[in-house]
Amino acid sequence: REIVKTKATATGTTLTGGEQIVEGVANETTINDGGIQTVSANGEAVKTTINEGGTLTVNDNGKATDIIQNSGAALQTSTANGI
């Protein structure tokens, strides 16, 4: 489990069966089978690729841009802002 705190940036992370909670910025993340990336309020995911079995969840006031959602991948939002 990785937590990207406010004002912090994580770049080039690959999630396979792990979880990343984004309160800051996550760039160029790849989410594979069993991986979960959760973007919290005021967090931002940029250039994320979601592969089969992976999940990207964007909570209220979170932001996700330049997302690639491949077949079998899940993109869940509680808000339409920033998608």
Where do the PLM segments sit?
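The right-handed parallel beta-helix/beta-solenoid scaffold, focusing on the short coil/turn
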Residues: 1-2, 6-19, 24-29, 35-37, ...
